[in-house]
Amino acid sequence: MLKIKLEKTTFENAKAECSLVFIVNKDFSHAWVKNKELLETFKYEGEGVFLDQENKILYAGVKEDDVHLLRESACLAVRTLKKLAFKSVKVGVYTCGTHSKDNALLENLKALFLGLKLGLYEYDTFKSNKKESVLKEAIVALELHKPCEKTCANSLEKSAKEALKYAEIMTESLNIVRDLVNTPPMIGTPVYMAEVAQKVAKENHLEIHVYDEKFLEEKKMNAFLAVNKASLGVNPPRLIHLVYKPKKAKKKIALVGKGLTYDCGGLSLKPADYMVTMKADKGGGSAVIGLLNVLAKLGVEAEVHGIIGATENMIGPAAYKPDDILISKEGKSIEVRNTDAEGRLVLADCLSYAQDLNPDVIVDFATLTGACVVGLGEFTSAIMGHNEELKNLFETSGLESGELLAKLPFNRHLKKLIESKIADVCNISSSRYGGAITAGLFLNEFIRDEFKDKWLHIDIAGPAYVEKEWDVNSFGASGAGVRACTAFVEELLKKA
């Protein structure tokens, strides 16, 4: 991980092997830009990166005056620098976006530091010849690249320290999630997932309970159990329950995650091409583990419960079947018409378990539907639920964190598509349309009336795992949901 060192000095006086200078909104006028003739010769107009080898300066373009583009550009710059031979880089402080906001400086620093730190991530566990980055340190000169109000300058050091703490915690947590999601299925089993959760619990002094199939049977979590039937003798299920309890808690929050460590579709077998990347079906459960790490280290004033349903969905003689009828923990019967709609079965029982804790807010995370990716693209998560205020808060705070989110509305017509003639509800829609919403409506069937306005469903199927670099995310797992939910919890507690 890149070490960031704060120094109370000017950018010119800071010492490092190379310099990183951002060109914000194609503005070449500030003093840190050197050798403008060279930039003009090579027609560098402030987009992408450009290396001035003579002066050892890497220029990185920030296309617009936008804090999210600053974060992305910082990440791109580090990705470029790690291919070079510099051990250290110096950078100043930039302010982008809405300068009138009270926390504008802090948010810019968070974005800068997080972008720098995430730029070094690469999942290379199984590479024979690992290429370790020479770049080890970023020196941040506590000098603003352009004048601002005196109050802004006076708060620079304090804001920088707070932002650095956030960036270090968030980077560590995102990388825990990324590593877990990227772990191949022969290693990343339900038991392995529980072991990762136990490490996080131990480090943060969290309470943790890991339950096996016997507990699931006792609690009548039959929908969850059914999904695991083909794997029971080899990779049994685990219900993981993490608990963070601060001395002072304004809210009790339950975070629920789908932890499908591998999903071949069960007897409703996926085509071969669609099985590839299904190690990422544990993205929701992994995000919950990462969130407990973030929220505990930040010391938020909320009692937080992280509940993960970890299992495989495989084929075998004991596998559950289309036409099965399952009795869930809530007592509702489920007609199974497609065994590849399994994540919602696991979540149904886990959400029931979460409601028994009587939380003030419930948020579930799942790589639930391909339909969500079709509708919103691979970079955007969907928000569903009944409480407009809660949905709006998650969307606005999540967007400010740098994640992309959009609300999808429930409606009575789509609800009819999951009706069953022989059970209380069907696990698959009778129509090919609106699949992300009908999956959310299925989960809604297991939310008790008193919790309807306390529950949010986040479908992270698109951004949880993308096979290319984008924004601050490397090839593979991104840690989708972690930044957004952290911001949501912080804003929720401000209103408490």
Swiss-Prot record:
Which residues constitute the catalytic centre? K270, R344
Q: Which cofactor does it need?
A: Mn(2+)
Q: Name one GO biological process term.
A: proteolysis
Q: Which EC numbers does the record give?
A: 3.4.11.1, 3.4.11.10
CDD domains, per the entry:
Peptidase_M17
**What are the record keywords, sorted?**
Aminopeptidase, Cytoplasm, Hydrolase, Manganese, Metal-binding, Protease
Kindly give the PROSITE patterns that the UniProt entry links to this protein. CYTOSOL_AP
Q: What are the binding positions for Mn(2+) 1 in this chain?
A: D263, D340, E342
Its UniProt entry gives the catalysed reaction(s) as: Release of an N-terminal amino acid, Xaa-|-Yaa-, in which Xaa is preferably Leu, but may be other amino acids including Pro although not Arg or Lys, and Yaa may be Pro. Amino acid amides and methyl esters are also readily hydrolyzed, but rates on arylamides are exceedingly low; Release of an N-terminal amino acid, preferentially leucine, but not glutamic or aspartic acids
A Pfam match: Peptidase_M17_N
Which residues are listed for Mn(2+) 2 binding in this entry?
Answer: K258, D263, D281, E342
Subcellular compartments: Cytoplasm
Give the CC-aspect GO terms. Answer: cytoplasm
Note accompanying the cofactor annotation: Binds 2 manganese ions per subunit.
Q: What InterPro entries has UniProt attached to this entry?
A: Leucine_aapep/pepB, Macro_dom-like, Peptidase_M17_C, Peptidase_M17_leu_NH2_pept, Peptidase_M17_N
Q: Which GO terms describe its molecular function?
A: manganese ion binding; metalloaminopeptidase activity
Q: Describe its function.
A: Presumably involved in the processing and regular turnover of intracellular proteins. Catalyzes the removal of unsubstituted N-terminal amino acids from various peptides.
**Family stated for the protein in its record:** Belongs to the peptidase M17 family.
HAMAP family per UniProt: Cytosol_peptidase_M17 (MF_00181)
Q: What is this protein called?
A: Probable cytosol aminopeptidase
